[in-house]
Amino acid sequence: MKIIWSPISIDRITEIAKYIAIDNRRAANTWIEEVFKKVEQLQSFPRSGRIVPELNEDIIREIIYGNYRIIYRIELKQISILTIRNIRQILPEIEVK
C-alpha cells in the first residue's frame, strides 16, 4: 500500500521536530526517522493500529510513538497519514476529515 502524508501531517511533524530541536537537534532527527519507520510498517500491517477512540471508525486508526499519536486512514490502495498529535492534546476534528 502507498503512504500519503496530508499537508496537516507534514506541518505537524515539522512543528514537533522544531520543538524537539530547541533542546537537541540530534534527538529531533532521530524522532523524525523513527516516525517514518513506524509509518512504513503500516504498508504491511495497515490494521496494526488501534481504532481512534474519539471517532470509533474502523478505517481511522492510530499508532503510538513515544508521546505522539500518528493518526491515519486506511483507503483502498493507500494509507493516508492525517495528523500527528501529542497524546495529551485534544484531537481537532478538522485534522481527521
Regions found by a protein language model. Name each.
Residues 61-63:
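Short acidic-hydrophobic surface loop/beta-edge motif
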Residues 65-68, 73-97:
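Enriched for short, Lys/Arg-rich terminal
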